[in-house]
Amino acid sequence: MKITSANDRKTKQASSNWFTGTVWQDSIIEAPDPARVRALRVSFEPGARTAWHTHPLGQTLYIVHGTGLICVRNNKPQLMRMGDTIWIPPLEEHWHGATTTNSMTHIAIQEAQNGQVAEWLEQVTDEDYSY
């Protein structure tokens, strides 16, 4: 068993390769092999969002603060609110983030396949982000 203190977790700013705007990440679960589960607390400032991406085994989001958006390729963004849980099936192209006027924090839970939890695609355009 391993207990990780909250004081030992490092908050880091998310990479601009995969995010637009200011996004902060805290690793919650980085279970060693053979376990596959990974979880992050991700905080998006207003207007911030992920790039388009997929997850090999799907992803669950749980909204812990604020109001956000989630969008599946070729669809309009949908609102996510505090307390909502969203399941994204394996390999579904999507993005998620805050609205233009509200911050949003979610817990992102996904499993790794061959060490990979996501495949990152292109950045989300302002047109795709409009709701």
Language-model-detected regions and their locations in the chain:
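Short beta-strand His + acidic residue motifs that chelate non-heme Fe in jelly-roll/DSBH
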Residues: T50-W52, I70-C71, I88, E93-T100
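Conserved short histidine dyad/triad with adjacent acidic residue
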Residues: W24-S27, R38-H55
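A short hydrophobic beta-strand segment most commonly corresponding to one strand
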Residues: T60, W87, T101-L121
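Glycine- and acidic-residue-biased ligand/ion/polar-headgroup-sensing regions
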Residues: L57-L69, R73-N74
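A short, N-terminal "cap"/entry segment at the start of jelly-roll beta-barrel domains
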Residues: M1-R36, V117-Y131
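Short acidic-glycine-tyrosine-enriched beta hairpin
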Residues: N74-L91
